[in-house]
Structure formats: structure tokens, C-alpha cells
Amino acid sequence: MFDIGFWELVLISVIGLVVLGPERLPHAIRSVMHWITTAKNMANSVKTEVTQELKLHEINENMIKASKQGLSDLDPELQKSIDEMKETAEQLSRPYKKDIDDIKTSLDKNPSGTTQQENSILDSSKTTPPRQDKNE
């Protein structure tokens, strides 16, 4: 990573031994190794995030291009993801399909949008209530 050879490491070790002494040198080496490990992990994390963002950006651009060109000649990976989304949407709507079909058929039979029970309630509400005497 830093392109440091064997003799450079020996020189750094000797200088560290002279400056820090034999008691504090192992602790200093552990601290430096911990910092280096943390820096490597952070760099790998940033690298994976950038890779994911670039892939998302590429997919987004492909989707925009596909919507402009139509869905005829898509990238196979993009076509696969679109098919998966359609299948998921279909699976989510399956439990409600029977209810939707029932509602459509009832609306086709009764275009006003009210059921027979609602019609009977509406008809009964149209009758005038019995007249009450003022003396009571």
C-alpha cells in the first residue's frame, strides 16, 4: 500500500524503539495497526457504497432510456428486474382480485353504485315519519 521495503521497516522500528522505548513500543504498534485496520474498513465501506450507487444510477439511466425507446429492446438484466417487479405486483394483488371482480360485477348489474340493501334503506328513509301531536 505504501510501497515500504524491508529496510525501511527496520529503520522505522529502530527509530520507534529509541524514541518510545521497549515498554511503550508494542502498545504504539497495536494502536497504529488498529488505525490502519479502521482506515481500510472505512475505505472498503466507501468503495462498496460507491459501487452500489453507480449500479443504481446505471439502472435508473437504463430505465429512463427504456421508457423513451419503449420496452421492446431492453438489457436482459433490466428486463429480468422489470419482470420480477410485475410478478411481485401480481402476487400482491391476487388476494384482492376476487373482491375487485365482485365489485365490478355488482357495479355492472346496478350502475348507480348502490346495492339492493342500500336501495331498500334509501326507499324506507323517503317515507315520512308519523306525525306527532303537539299536545304530547
UniProtKB/Swiss-Prot annotation:
Biased composition (Polar residues): 108-130
One cellular component term from this protein's GO annotations in UniProt: TAT protein transport complex
Record Pfam families: TatA_B_E (PF02416)
Gene: tatB
Oligomer status and interactors: The Tat system comprises two distinct complexes: a TatABC complex, containing multiple copies of TatA, TatB and TatC subunits, and a separate TatA complex, containing only TatA subunits. Substrates initially bind to the TatABC complex, which probably triggers association of the separate TatA complex to form the active translocon.
Superkingdom to which the source organism belongs: Bacteria
Keywords from the UniProt entry: Cell inner membrane, Cell membrane, Membrane, Protein transport, Translocation, Transmembrane, Transmembrane helix, Transport
Entry function: Part of the twin-arginine translocation (Tat) system that transports large folded proteins containing a characteristic twin-arginine motif in their signal peptide across membranes. Together with TatC, TatB is part of a receptor directly interacting with Tat signal peptides. TatB may form an oligomeric binding site that transiently accommodates folded Tat precursor proteins before their translocation.
Subcellular location: Cell inner membrane
Name assigned to this protein: Sec-independent protein translocase protein TatB
Signal sequence coordinates: none
Any GO MF annotation of the entry: protein transmembrane transporter activity
Source organism of this protein record: Psychromonas ingrahamii (strain DSM 17664 / CCUG 51855 / 37)
Entry keyword Transcription: no
One of the protein's GO biological processes: protein transport by the Tat complex
Transmembrane segments annotated in the record for this chain: 1-21
InterPro entries: TatA/B/E (IPR003369), TatB (IPR018448)
Keyword Heme part of the UniProt annotation: no
Listed Gene3D superfamilies: 1.20.5.3310
Region Disordered, residue ranges: 66-136
Basic and acidic residues composition bias: residue spans: 77-89, 96-107
Family that this chain belongs to: Belongs to the TatB family.
Bilayer topology term: Single-pass membrane protein
Principal place of residence: membrane
